Amino acid sequence: MKNLLVPLAIIGAGVLTYSASVSSRTLINIDPDWAFAFGHTDPAKDFGRGTEYFNYLTKANSIHNAGPYSPKFNDSLWHRVDLPFDFVVDLPYDSLASHSHGYKTVGYKYPETSVGWYRKTFTLQPEDSTAHYDLMFDGIFRDSQVWVNGFYLGGEPSGYTRQRYDITPYLNYGPDSDNVIAVRSDATFEEGWFYEGGGIYRHAWLEKSPLVRLMPDKTRVQYSSSDNGNGKVTVSGIIENLSHADIKDLKVIVNITSLSGQPVPGGASSISVPAVIKPRGEAKWHIDLKPQDLKLWSPDTPERYDVTVTLQDNGRDIESERIRTGFRTLTFDPDKGLFVNGRHYKIHGVDQHQDHPGAGAGIQDAVNVYRLKELKKYGINTVRTSHNPFTPEAIAAADSLGIMLVEENRLLGINDYHTGQLEKMIDRDFNHPSVILWSVGNEEWGVEWDKRGDRIVKDLRNISHSLDSTRLMTVATSSGPTVVISPDVAGYNYIMQNPVEEHRRNYPDRIAFGSEETTGSGTRGVYFDDKANGHMASLNRTPDKDGTLNRIARGWTFYRDRPWLLGLCYWTGFDYRGEPNPLVFPATGSEFGILDYAGFPKDEAFYLQSQWTDQPVLHILPHWNLEGHEGETIDIWVYSNMDEVELNVNGRNLGRKKVTPGQHVSFPAVYKPGKVTAKGYKNGKPVKTSVTETSGPAEKLDIETAHEQDGIRIINVTLRDRKGRFAPTACNPLTIHLSEGQTLLGSGNGDPAFRIKERPAPGEHPDAFTLPAFNGHAQFIVKGSGPVNITLDK
């Protein structure tokens, strides 16, 4: 069998930070203070967009333009919002709206609430007029159009692709000369079959740089190992000349330092670029370095470094770019699996959409970090970014936390629309060590069973390798065989749908992993179906069509016991808005996650924690507040990594059972309010005791700041009874009282049938906000310092 060693196994990091000097590149965040209003799909109701005699497509900057893209347009009656701002979050629900998008009133049935307009006014100083300016949007959903000072810049159909526009010649300078950015986003059509939101839901930037600069997203840092462990680092890039004169005799200097700024021995070098670069011309460069004693990046040791690239002209620094990156090698072996820096890792993964209560698709950076940290608690070491690239900030967070990523492009195809998205994704995230695979598609049913699928994937494999020779690519199939013949790594969505063993016999050199596998999860804290109210019990406690109980265990043990499989990603990590299958309205969100929508754990999270971490786990389910089921026989399960588990119910010892690795233990018992106690044994000795007890009504609150970053706090609330016992069915209203300087950014409770207001609407600034808890938990996302006062309505 052959070993596939990813050459120059990459590295990198990629949140770019820049020197703040005037001559250097400066990345200016322009999220605050935008004007927002709904437009319409009918041009006559869309502020007259495009109806002028000379419209924005007729003349470059027609004086007849009067719509929101015109600098003279009056937006004083519009709402003021800060980005990211997903305008769909505040829309009502409707049982006739899109099932896949969570029954929000957006889409082709709702022309009056599917188009969002954004405007921002800013000024530049006269001394800034010698710089180059790019306007960037990390994500606008979707079918966006962008103008600056009335000049139409272009647009992007997809909601998941970064946009960059040169706006240098269109700008005004001076304190009395305004500049106006206008953006129109149209969420009429869906790209996904899951909630996608609408509008500018990711960050916006103004990038100021010198006219001679390092081409954005083209500086690459590559690492290759050597026998002595030191390895080689190659840094390469492109210089572009945006001035009106020839440029020559430039110099590029590279320095590798620790995050604290300490130089790495052997981590400095320079190269002259003698070529004459014509206006709008380019020059490529590369530098090889042999740094000593590098600490390599891995899921267990996510070591990172700063690689600073300085561009000089006659000894004068004209630009400096800092790339935060990590160094590591990847080996994919068709018989033994994945190796990072020579150490074997099994993929313990989840698939993940990117939305959250109160924010929708416009997730704050702090919330992205919170979500990844919560997943890591339960042993997750890999996330597949289903089914589109994540935000740059989430990718950087994965670097710092040691979470590997399978980063996925939005749509399968080989034309400019598809490959342009793929190229932008790879260019943006090439320097991130967390990214281990590029995924070029997911469940393309129309071509999974015929030769076209094979041809498309072969082309995409070659295109991917031409864009990045250091990583392999994959594609996910739901059952059709043709699209998993040609990729570097086959991705299987569900072992019940794919003949994985047969493919192994037919293609023994193929590398493969489980790109999706069922968790079997249901509604957190629900053990009896209540589908009329949008809640369902976990499928794990009901036999599947093959007779299997505990489907999540079926998936893990299948991949665990086959060393030739890299591992698996469960569908999903968090619940997400939309796609509430198999339920319909009033359910509005999925229930596939091991964590609910807000990040509170379901029972399945503890199953994975028992299998994927070394910490002792002894988790009892169900809870013991099963009102209405008195006298019924209940199967009490325990998820554990102990050797044996002993169970006591209401003072009666039900015995001690051996734990089959990867499985649960079960004890039938008649339900009566009281106490369930589990005791776990290792090597015959008691190691851990867990208790679940029937609680009284909620009377107390545990308030925890689960994560704090950038002045934003994720505050989790747990409801308890008078004795301090968790109240697992409590749904009491909670009120957060905001003090001066505090803003509620969002709230949620993990209820997959949530259909009420989750944040103040634009223009509202309440002193208090009320949210019901759901099955003992709730969450508030607060911006601003100071104590937080949350009260319980008993």
What are these regions (language model features)?
Residues 21-136, 191, 197-200, 574, ...:
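Extended carbohydrate-recognition surfaces in non-catalytic/accessory domains of CAZymes
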Residues 30, 38, 46-67, 72, ...:
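Extended substrate-binding grooves/exosites of carbohydrate-active enzymes
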Residues 38-41, 87-90, 108-220, 242, ...:
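Accessory beta-strand-rich segments of carbohydrate-active enzymes
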Residues 332, 613-635, 691-714, 720-723, ...:
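Short S/T/G/P-enriched beta-strand
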Residues 73, 247-253, 266, 299-306, ...:
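Short flexible loop/turn segments that cap and initiate beta-strands
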Residues 167-169, 286-296, 666-671, 764-786:
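Short, hydrophobic beta-strand segments
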Residues 174, 238-333, 664, 672-673, ...:
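Extended acidic/polar, glycine-enriched regions
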